Amino acid sequence: MKVLQCWDDGVVSDIRLIEILKKYNATATFNLCIGKNGEDREVVGQFEEVDIVSLKRSELYDLYKDFDVANHSLTHPFLSSLSYEEVHHEVAQNKAQLETVFHREIKGFCYPFGSALLLKSVEPFPSPVIYSFMVIRTVV
């Protein structure tokens, strides 16, 4: 088993995080939901009364180009609430769009909400959606 340092969702706080990672020559994987990154930055949630703001899609390449990028689904849904076809759409479309933005193969997948255990099956992906690694559980 391999332990990865992963950060999710493509948010503005990643700008400072990446400055720190680069300063210490650290690696990380960023799990992105490109459907959440539009033409403008927007508030996508709150954590402890602090706004969580998504990055603009046009910011993604320059920010994450020196790091691993993984698929985190298109819109970050509870995959267990979707049909097989909807899960496939969420995963395949996000992978394709990420590969277009980053000009490279996306080899990893991280389940939204941090756990494959939310799914009825841990293998929801028909070919050709194949990954070198999958994050199936996160620790906060």
Residue spans for each PLM region:
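Catalytic domains of cell-wall/extracellular-matrix polysaccharide-remodeling enzymes
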Residues: 13-16, 76-140
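Acidic (Asp/Glu)-rich catalytic clusters
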Residues: 18-25, 49-71, 98-100, 129-130
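Conserved, mostly hydrophobic/aromatic
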Residues: 8, 21, 30, 72, ...
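A short alpha/beta connector and helix-capping loop motif
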Residues: 15-36
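The substrate-binding groove and active-site-proximal loops of carbohydrate-active enzymes
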Residues: 1-10, 44-50, 76-83, 112-114
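Structural preference for beta-strand elements that scaffold enzyme active sites
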Residues: 2-4, 27-29, 66-70, 106-108, ...
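Short, charged, surface-exposed secondary-structure boundary motifs
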Residues: 21, 39-43, 82
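Short, flexible/disordered intra-domain loops and linkers
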Residues: 39-51, 116-125
